[in-house]
């Protein structure tokens, strides 16, 4: 089972990462945010915390999010594109679970969606919903 964790403090984030390493040792992904910077990092397997922050040590982030991955679907090789977090438009997500209707969703929203990971389509869904709500608001 995957681990999803986050903190507003770097040291607490590192502690949470160390506690979640065993929950998913296939890959680790991170999202670091402040008002002007968003950094997404992904690594195969378990890495030392210092690698998560390489080149960002001097940046003062306000939010640290992480995901340790243990794939629940078919066996696959590590790839940046098939590891959390997933990004589309304004949305970045990490998800723990299985979308049992992934095939239907994929066909409904974008039959050319190439990513085999079910969770990867969630930010596309959010982005589509945002666009629909914007259209509805403009029609009122």
Name each region found by the language model.
Residues 1-140:
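Conserved short alpha-helical segments that host acidic/polar catalytic motifs at enzyme active sites
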């Amino acid at each position: 089972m995957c681990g999803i964790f986050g903190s507003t403090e770097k040291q607490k984030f590192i502690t949470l990462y160390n506690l979640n390493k065993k929950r998913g040792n296939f890959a680790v992904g991170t999202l670091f945010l402040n008002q002007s910077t968003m950094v997404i990092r992904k690594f195969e397997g378990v890495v030392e915390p210092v690698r998560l922050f390489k080149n960002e040590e001097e940046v003062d982030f306000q939010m640290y999010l992480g995901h340790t991955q243990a794939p629940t679907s078919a066996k696959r090789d590590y790839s940046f594109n098939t590891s959390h977090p997933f990004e589309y438009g304004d949305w970045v997500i990490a998800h723990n679970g299985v979308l049992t209707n992934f095939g239907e969703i994929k066909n409904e929203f974008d039959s050319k969606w190439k990513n085999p990971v079910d969770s990867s389509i969630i930010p596309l869904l959010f982005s589509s919903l945002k666009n629909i709500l914007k259209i509805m608001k403009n029609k009122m």
